[in-house]
């Protein structure tokens, strides 16, 4: 899915999905499970559910944590032929972190950076440091590890489908469902989606006043920072 084969395919993780959240335990477990399966002819790593938004653009509906982890592991293995075909909708820092990996800038998604470091540690601890062992693991991961890709039909009601997916496994919190329903109304409008994402992220961080989280604070809250000077969502400034 990530090989640089000349086919320009992009997997986009939509705004309603959680940030990347796999920790040391999950990443170690996955790498160990794959390593324990080296003698098998194939290893199925899970299921990916997507919705085709454009000719070669797939919106990830389910499986984004696992898909992102696969990408992180490939980068941690130092495989240079991996195409940059995974990104985040309306999350510039996360998208930039994925794109620049393993060379992270000052602005970075901590969850993704931590995941990369955990993957590096796990590879060293489980696979070892011998070139032959690492090469064997790389070859298996690239050629024998498979993910089942299910593409949702075009006529499917995504709101309903998302609710069904959420009824199994680890359920979303109520505020995450609200976020999904609101963002669904903005699909197709990248500028509006980006605005919504920044507003939501600023409001969801309860450790700061919202004025401290928005660079456009004087435009939105006035010079005293105590007013609300815009009258509609359309007036909220774009980041561009």
What are these regions (language model features)?
Residues 1-240:
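Covalent nucleotidyltransferase
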């Amino acid at each position: 899915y990530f090989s640089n084969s000349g086919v320009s395919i992009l997997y986009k993780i939509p705004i309603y999905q959680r940030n990347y959240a796999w920790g040391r335990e999950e990443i170690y477990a996955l790498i160990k499970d794959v390593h324990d399966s080296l003698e098998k002819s194939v290893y199925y790593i899970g299921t990916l559910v997507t919705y085709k938004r454009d000719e070669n653009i797939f919106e990830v509906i389910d499986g984004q944590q696992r898909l992102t982890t696969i990408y992180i592991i490939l980068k941690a293995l130092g495989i240079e032929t991996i195409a940059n075909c995974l990104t985040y909708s309306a999350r510039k820092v996360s998208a930039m972190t994925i794109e620049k990996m393993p060379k992270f800038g000052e602005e970075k998604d901590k969850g993704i950076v931590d995941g990369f470091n955990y993957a590096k540690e796990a590879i060293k601890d489980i696979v070892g440091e011998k070139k032959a062992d690492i090469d064997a693991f790389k070859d298996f991961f690239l050629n024998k590890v498979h993910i089942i890709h299910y593409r949702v039909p075009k006529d499917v009601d995504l709101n309903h489908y998302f609710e069904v997916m959420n009824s199994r496994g680890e359920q979303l919190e109520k505020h995450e469902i609200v976020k999904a329903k609101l963002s669904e109304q903005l699909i197709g409008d990248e500028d509006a989606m980006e605005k919504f994402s920044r507003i939501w992220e600023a409001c969801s961080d309860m450790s700061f006043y919202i004025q401290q989280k928005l660079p456009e604070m004087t435009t939105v809250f006035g010079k005293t920072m105590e007013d609300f000077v815009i009258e509609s969502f359309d007036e909220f400034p774009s980041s561009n």
